[in-house]
Amino acid sequence: MFCPFCSIQETKVIDSRLVADGHQVRRRRECTMCKERFTTFEMAELVMPRVVKRDGSREPFNEDKLRAGLQRALEKRPVSTEQVEQCISRLKSAMRATGEREITSEYLGNLIMDALKELDKVAYVRFASVYRSFEDIREFGEEIARLGD
């Protein structure tokens, strides 16, 4: 790796440790020429499956879209940003674990609803009402009754 201070290619690793729940490696490096030290982070670049929409169109997985949907459902709920990020991480892991190049938006929606059911039941009902296009109060009641089961 090139030294960011003197641009020479000779650096050595003086310390390595796992961070971010084992998903990243933090390395402390030292330049053999100028002796400056710097930190690098390494993580696997994993390809996310494409999402097949209900109309048959395909689009790349968009983490920002997922985050926005979760935050909308969780608005004014007692759920921390850290919990949301952990939820996103688990959802992405579940998507990759399918081993598929493409997943349906229906499958993704069901994954999200399962995650929200565990995280916050009110947010789950909010998300389900939009995702399942509830038409009237009866459908809300039925979904809430299913939560009690």
UniProtKB/Swiss-Prot annotation:
Entry keyword set: ATP-binding, DNA-binding, Metal-binding, Nucleotide-binding, Repressor, Transcription, Transcription regulation, Zinc, Zinc-finger
Family under the similarity heading: Belongs to the NrdR family.
Listed cofactors: Zn(2+)
Organism annotation: Pseudoalteromonas atlantica (strain T6c / ATCC BAA-1087)
Matching HAMAP family: NrdR (MF_00440)
Annotated protein name in UniProt: Transcriptional repressor NrdR
Role noted for this protein: Negatively regulates transcription of bacterial ribonucleotide reductase nrd genes and operons by binding to NrdR-boxes.
InterPro entries referenced in this protein's UniProt entry, alphabetically: ATP-cone_dom, NrdR-like_N, RNR_NrdR-like
GO biological process, alphabetically ordered: negative regulation of DNA-templated transcription
Single GO term (MF): ATP binding
ATP-cone domain ranges (all copies): 49-139
Organism superkingdom: Bacteria
Chain positions of all zinc fingers (unnamed): 3-34
Cofactor comment text: Binds 1 zinc ion.
Database matches in Pfam families: ATP-cone, Zn_ribbon_NrdR
